[in-house]
């Protein structure tokens, strides 16, 4: 029998887009799904709208495994955690209610995950759709080969983090629920930045301990990320470089291993320097792309210009 895949969707005042997403999920090429929506204390009619869609859908298809839960507002992290407690699948994937996925999204993630028994998770590329500018671009459809797969798992993950952005979010991946439940992994509640990254890193550490130390890559842009629907809190959090620094510190702690040889430690330091440069550039781009006045943008960017140039020079050596 085909494995049951749990799909967790947090909803907060996004009823219309959630219904659009759910309608597409009922037409996925992979059918053995458990779809769990979690209303995170919506202040509009989202809960009722989605509930009615589910009721009507079940009248048409009695085998449809779709439900909606409700909780007081805790953010997407809290909503996902509640969803995880209710899952009964073998694998789990997360989708944001204002995003979209292509028809073979779940099937492709599953095939990639199960292709290699040692795979901890599978990850796909995505379409980055900028709603305000009405543009879109495909990302992460290329293979990454850093040569570290057989050397050191955490160094390999660090090299992926420093190479591009496919490993940071939870939304374009499929995870093993057995690993999550055994290690009691949750999303950190109350963070306004990089909670996804912390969840992924905690998961990968637990997966490594369970002898899952490979990553399955789906080289297709199957996840459609709609940029421009974020809340003001989410948008402003990426403007603060202190948030990027905290995330970097968390990654630095995660990658440490007392058993590392001097050679592996040196290798990790090299990739950490590259990652820090990447974070500085990503922060600068987030500020540059914002709608704030130029004078305010410079206030955020000015303290970073000289350190950025200095670090870039070091890495060239």
Regions found by a protein language model. Name each.
Residues 13-27:
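Short, well-formed alpha-helical segments that are part of the catalytic scaffolds
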Residues 32-41, 67-72, 96-97:
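Short beta-strand/loop segment that forms part of the nucleotide-sugar
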Residues 39-50:
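A conserved acidic beta->alpha catalytic loop
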Residues 153-237:
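Conserved nucleotide-sugar donor-binding catalytic segment
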Residues 216-317:
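C-terminal subregions of glycosyltransferases and related glycan-biosynthesis enzymes
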């Amino acid at each position: 029998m085909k494995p049951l895949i749990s799909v967790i969707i947090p909803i907060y005042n996004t009823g219309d887009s959630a219904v659009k997403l759910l309608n597409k999920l009922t037409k996925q090429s992979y059918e053995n799904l458990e779809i769990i929506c979690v209303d995170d204390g919506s202040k509009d009619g989202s809960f009722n709208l989605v509930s009615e869609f589910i009721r009507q859908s079940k009248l048409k298809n009695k085998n449809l495994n779709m439900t909606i839960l409700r909780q007081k507002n805790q953010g997407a992290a809290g909503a996902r955690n509640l969803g995880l407690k209710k899952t009964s699948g073998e694998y789990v994937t997360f989708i944001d209610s204002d995003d979209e996925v292509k028809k073979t999204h779940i099937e492709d993630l599953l095939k990639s995950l199960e292709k290699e028994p040692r795979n901890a998770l599978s990850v796909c590329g995505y379409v980055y759709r900028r709603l305000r500018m009405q543009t879109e671009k495909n990302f992460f459809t290329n293979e990454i080969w850093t040569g570290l797969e057989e050397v050191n798992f955490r160094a390999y993950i660090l090299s992926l983090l420093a190479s591009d952005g496919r490993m940071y979010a939870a939304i374009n991946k499929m995870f093993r629920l057995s690993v999550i439940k055994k290690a009691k992994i949750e999303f950190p509640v109350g963070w306004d930045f990089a909670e996804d990254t912390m969840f992924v890193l905690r998961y990968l550490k637990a997966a490594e301990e369970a002898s899952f130390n490979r990553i399955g890559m789906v080289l297709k842009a199957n996840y459609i990320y709609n940029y421009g629907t974020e809340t003001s809190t989410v948008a402003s959090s990426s403007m603060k470089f202190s948030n990027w620094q905290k995330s970097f510190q968390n990654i630095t702690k995660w990658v440490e291993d007392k058993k590392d040889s001097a050679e592996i430690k040196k290798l990790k330091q090299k990739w950490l320097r590259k990652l820090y440069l990447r974070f500085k550039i990503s922060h600068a781009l987030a500020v540059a792309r914002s709608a704030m006045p130029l004078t305010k943008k410079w206030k955020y960017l000015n303290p970073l210009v000289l350190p950025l140039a200095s670090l870039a020079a070091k890495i060239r050596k």
